[in-house]
Amino acid sequence: MQLKIMPKKKRLSAGRVPLILFLCQMISALEVPLDPKLLEDLVQPPTITQQSPKDYIIDPRENIVIQCEAKGKPPPSFSWTRNGTHFDIDKDPLVTMKPGTGTLIINIMSEGKAETYEGVYQCTARNERGAAVSNNIVVRPSRSPLWTKEKLEPITLQSGQSLVLPCRPPIGLPPPIIFWMDNSFQRLPQSERVSQGLNGDLYFSNVLPEDTREDYICYARFNHTQTIQQKQPISVKVISVDELNDTIAANLSDTEFYGAKSSRERPPTFLTPEGNASNKEELRGNVLSLECIAEGLPTPIIYWAKEDGMLPKNRTVYKNFEKTLQIIHVSEADSGNYQCIAKNALGAIHHTISVRVKAAPYWITAPQNLVLSPGEDGTLICRANGNPKPRISWLTNGVPIEIAPDDPSRKIDGDTIIFSNVQERSSAVYQCNASNEYGYLLANAFVNVLAEPPRILTPANTLYQVIANRPALLDCAFFGSPLPTIEWFKGAKGSALHEDIYVLHENGTLEIPVAQKDSTGTYTCVARNKLGMAKNEVHLEIKDPTWIVKQPEYAVVQRGSMVSFECKVKHDHTLSLTVLWLKDNRELPSDERFTVDKDHLVVADVSDDDSGTYTCVANTTLDSVSASAVLSVVAPTPTPAPVYDVPNPPFDLELTDQLDKSVQLSWTPGDDNNSPITKFIIEYEDAMHKPGLWHHQTEVSGTQTTAQLKLSPYVNYSFRVMAVNSIGKSLPSEASEQYLTKASEPDKNPTAVEGLGSEPDNLVITWKPLNGFESNGPGLQYKVSWRQKDGDDEWTSVVVANVSKYIVSGTPTFVPYLIKVQALNDMGFAPEPAVVMGHSGEDLPMVAPGNVRVNVVNSTLAEVHWDPVPLKSIRGHLQGYRIYYWKTQSSSKRNRRHIEKKILTFQGSKTHGMLPGLEPFSHYTLNVRVVNGKGEGPASPDRVFNTPEGVPSAPSSLKIVNPTLDSLTLEWDPPSHPNGILTEYTLKYQPINSTHELGPLVDLKIPANKTRWTLKNLNFSTRYKFYFYAQTSAGSGSQITEEAVTTVDEAGILPPDVGAGKVQAVNPRISNLTAAAAETYANISWEYEGPEHVNFYVEYGVAGSKEEWRKEIVNGSRSFFGLKGLMPGTAYKVRVGAVGDSGFVSSEDVFETGPAMASRQVDIATQGWFIGLMCAVALLILILLIVCFIRRNKGGKYPVKEKEDAHADPEIQPMKEDDGTFGEYSDAEDHKPLKKGSRTPSDRTVKKEDSDDSLVDYGEGVNGQFNEDGSFIGQYSGKKEKEPAEGNESSEAPSPVNAMNSFV
């Protein structure tokens, strides 16, 4: 029994407080966290804890062990039935029962046969409280029969024909695993053309000449007995008619070859299954495997579809080059018609497979153990489902309930047994059996009626010590039936504790949330029920906290000096104190420079490595405090160092005492250059294996001039020597003479030996090969050996060339192997190698994580929990779990755009994880998958969850429009991320005086459905600052700010001597805002009407963006300004403002940088200079016409008329009154899109393709600039480039600017 107490807590009130102790509905009666002495007296019905599987296939070569274990009080006795009758084990000398359990051991290794003990076994565990029964265990010995002998004729067929090589393995138990190999035990390659069917046959859609071989061998592996049987080899010869001589070809017909299929190109036909339709039945939870293999030329490709729905994306697996469709964890919803389509260039054919999914019984609610007190009520519920629906039957103590002794306290209602007013005699074990034609479920659940007086399990006189101002928890673990009530008392004769300062937990623990000195004392716990009372005393002591009186301080010291840190601690005198010093949160270095003296840490001869954080940690048995300080080390004032140099290289190298594995090298040292030589470094070159590369051999003292060197066999050595002093290393000496050592067997084996599978059915053994230096002789090879770790198989070995891997085929999936790799050469073997463990290839996990739960922490964070998958289903190394999650749509349904899936991976065996960065008020979906080295397993069922509302973002924009004398109108766009349902807007504003001081703040609430609001009764000519933000139920969002000025009072600007009504005031106005742009700059000009003494400023930014305006102040009262550093080809927004005593005015425009200069159409038709210029143009044209007329009258040949017709001057074209060329601009006109050939495009730029002439044409390309006064630089210089023909096809009137340029 496992007692589960919910971790609730409740305040004590006056009077008794009932406390649960105990056994409420227990999931299992196997894990009871109670005192062992209590368990010795607690009566409990038996419960089966371990049993053999229902379908128990045994190895006939080993003893039979049929497991049955159970627990109960008193310990249960065991009995067995075989094939429905009592099995008397005493009459069979080969059968024994394991002591203390019901497990049967049948000794067939000494004598007897496994077949004798085939049958259906059932175990019964019984004590005075009832009887529990096991499942029906069907015992069958495994079988691995030999292949029947058969004579296989060679097969000869033409290239392009189809072929089926039958396997037909012997029927074994369990069925064998089939694979095809050659006589070298190498897997035969498979492809879309050649593949193995589910029945083991090898199918060729069409054969090729390279398919010719004499060793097509089918193997059957019986995993249970670890045996492999093989079929006789099949010989296949593929020929073509062209290869036959004319005589044979003339007398040979297609029917004399294997099969009847033509060798010519042909549409697909199915080799398996046959016909146009077939049926398939599968059980729920299994893997549904559907197969279609077709022949044809060219090779057909297989496609799959479900007629009445989509294939389940996360559970569908394609295998065998898509010839096999598998659906994992098949359910009733997967029933239906599946179609496979075979297609090649000559046609297509399809086959329909009708799938019906049935279901063995599975639990909806399995019955749970029930523990009751006398007189209580309870229920046992047994609910299962299946297809067909299972039948529910009840047994009590292993006997059908219909014939069991009657119990007046129980009532059977279908799948439920109702108990009322139970007594101790009502204790029993009930069995629920749910069965249909595909299987059964059997569950034991006991009803245990107990009557026990209260017992307190906490040891008496337990002493609790607690630091003051911290919580104190006093335990009172208890047990009893019926449920006892718990009371606490303080002092020998104190009354029950019921003040608010105490908290009583349901497990009996008394909590004092903030313990004080006066909490010290003796506390008594009392447990009562109708059968008795129990009490226990515990003691509480309150201790003073530990604290650091003097903390260490930050220090900066020079290298080589000393530093001291002080740490004074005060603590409760009754507790022992230990003070520990740490450096960078680690123990102090084991260096005598660090000394601890009482309250001080002293560091002598400080070095740079001593820099860091030093922490003083004061510990008592009850608490711990710490304080830290940083030490910084600086360099002392440097002093000049003497000049030294590295040694000269050694010379006169000589080899003596030349043996097989050693040689003596001697040399003469070079000059040490005023610094003694401390050592010599000897290097060698292997001229045979790695010429030109020098390797470290050894080092000797600087006083030596000879060295005895150890050598390896089969190496052509050269040596060189370098001298080292305090300055550095010398240049190498000249190389010595070469010395070749004799060959011998290897003295070491390869390293880094590993065994990992690249496919589910192989084992790739890799190692780091020996280099030439380590080979010790010619003919280096490796002996690779392997066997399964779990089993008694002999080692399998193979000798391979000097490579770094070997692939073992036909292995079971993810099985541990023992591996060893031994080196050998022509001289012999290396020592016996070490054995390492590897694993055969991994396969994708089969099972999805179950019981996925989502706990939404807040609007942007969720916690996901799941149950781990069974280790056997992982089929590989567990890498972790992966969560796919995505937002399907906003909860407010305002955002339905597709969101990409996000992935979070949690390493290892974690069963929970956090999803950060979620969007508030959104609808999310997730699933969980287990990951191994091969990849991901199937996804768990999708889980959906919603995030709560969050605070909104700032409103997207805020504009102040239509300023008047006493009002301003605000317009805004809602937040781009509302993160919930907007409840209202808040507007706060305050005036700003001339000294930039802020006035009183006004707070205003605005309904959420508004996007415009007018503020009235404001002060005239006053600047206001506005703060604006949105709100949801979660709170207020970020604010957006803006400033605006009400217009000036018109009466206030009249001259003092003019009465009202005599002189009309003129409102300040900015007009004709012009933006002339080049590639990276623009010239902004405008006209201003209004009072003098104003300050202008220019604001600009990228059009359409939400970035803030960039502001530039205009010096003086100029009406132009140059913007620099702009991005080419970019549309900009610009506005010009004027601020003065008369208030605030502004004007806006949009321009675009680029090769065409941007210019807004200027209203110059009413300008005097323009009218004069037009008159001069007209006069010159008139003079030109008169001259031409005179010359023509004189008989001249100048073709004026033809030239005029060919190049009509746009300046003499009539101007239409309705084209607005000389009219005033209206708001509507400014925003109308212009047609091709119009004066100005809609974005207010002059583009080359829209006008015959442009300012750029008369400037220096795109580099035309402007003077400070706004005039053009280089406007009239250079030649005009040739324009496209369509540029002169516009029939509309030219712009005044173009007219001026044409004239010039």
UniProtKB/Swiss-Prot annotation:
Disulfide bridge partners, by residue number: 68-123, 167-218, 292-340, 382-432, 476-525, 567-616
Gene Ontology molecular function: any one: protein binding involved in heterotypic cell-cell adhesion
Signal sequence interval, chain numbering: 1-24
Outcome of substituting residue 1116 to V: In a breast cancer sample; somatic mutation
Compositionally skewed regions (Basic and acidic residues) per UniProt: 1199-1219, 1241-1250
Residues covered by region (Disordered): 1199-1304
Modified residues (Phosphothreonine): 1221
Phenotype upon changing residue 134 to P: In NEDNMS; uncertain significance
Domain (Fibronectin type-III) ranges: 649-744, 746-843, 848-950, 954-1051, 1064-1156
Effect listed in the UniProt record for changing residue 853 to C: In NEDNMS; uncertain significance
Membrane topology according to the record: Single-pass type I membrane protein
Spans through the membrane: 1168-1190
One BP term from GO: central nervous system development
Tissue specificity note: Detected in all the examined tissues. In the brain it was detected in the amygdala, caudate nucleus, corpus callosum, hippocampus, hypothalamus, substantia nigra, subthalamic nucleus and thalamus.
Membrane topology, Extracellular segments: 25-1167
GO CC terms, sorted: axon; axon initial segment; external side of plasma membrane; extracellular region; glutamatergic synapse; neuron projection; plasma membrane; postsynaptic density membrane
Glycosylation sites: 83, 223, 245, 251, 276, 314, 433, 507, 619, 716, 802, 858, 993, 1009, 1019, 1072, 1083, 1115
Residue numbers carrying Phosphotyrosine: 1225
Quaternary structure annotation from Swiss-Prot or TrEMBL: Constituent of a NFASC/NRCAM/ankyrin-G complex. Detected in a complex with CNTN1 and PTPRB. Interacts with GLDN/gliomedin. Interacts with MYOC.
Function: Cell adhesion protein that is required for normal responses to cell-cell contacts in brain and in the peripheral nervous system. Plays a role in neurite outgrowth in response to contactin binding. Plays a role in mediating cell-cell contacts between Schwann cells and axons. Plays a role in the formation and maintenance of the nodes of Ranvier on myelinated axons. Nodes of Ranvier contain clustered sodium channels that are crucial for the saltatory propagation of action potentials along myelinated axons. During development, nodes of Ranvier are formed by the fusion of two heminodes.
Protein name: Neuronal cell adhesion molecule
